[in-house]
């Protein structure tokens, strides 16, 4: 199964959602080697730091994409659904209630499922 984790909520400054997301990544690198993980970032320096801190750099089932749009971007509302489809993502996990509104239509067969925590 391919799971996408939206880590764009990890900002350079310490935040609650960012800490929560970092810990999810850290634990998944230790606990799950069966599923494939695609982790989304929008900041290269944050990506490098988190990749090292969580151990994802040594996990073969983790890959990262640095997007050119942030979580509050209007263009991201349109671009992210295409990325999820192109990457054949089964589950999209957002650690915040803000999700791309076009990415999860109910009537599309084989659609990506969404989890919000």
Predicted regions and their residues:
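Carbohydrate transferase catalytic cores enriched for Leloir-type hexosyltransferases
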Residues: 1-117
């Amino acid at each position: 199964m391919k799971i996408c984790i939206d880590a764009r909520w990890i900002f350079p400054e310490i935040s609650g959602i960012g800490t929560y997301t970092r810990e999810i990544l850290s634990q998944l690198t230790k606990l799950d080697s069966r599923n494939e993980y695609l982790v989304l970032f929008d900041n290269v320096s944050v990506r490098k730091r988190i990749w090292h801190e969580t151990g994802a750099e040594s996990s073969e089932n983790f890959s990262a994409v640095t997007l050119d749009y942030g979580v509050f971007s209007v263009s991201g509302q349109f671009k992210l659904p295409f990325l999820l489809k192109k990457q054949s993502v089964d589950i999209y996990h957002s650690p915040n209630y803000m999700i791309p509104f076009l990415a999860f239509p109910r009537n599309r067969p084989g659609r990506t499922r969404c989890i919000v925590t």
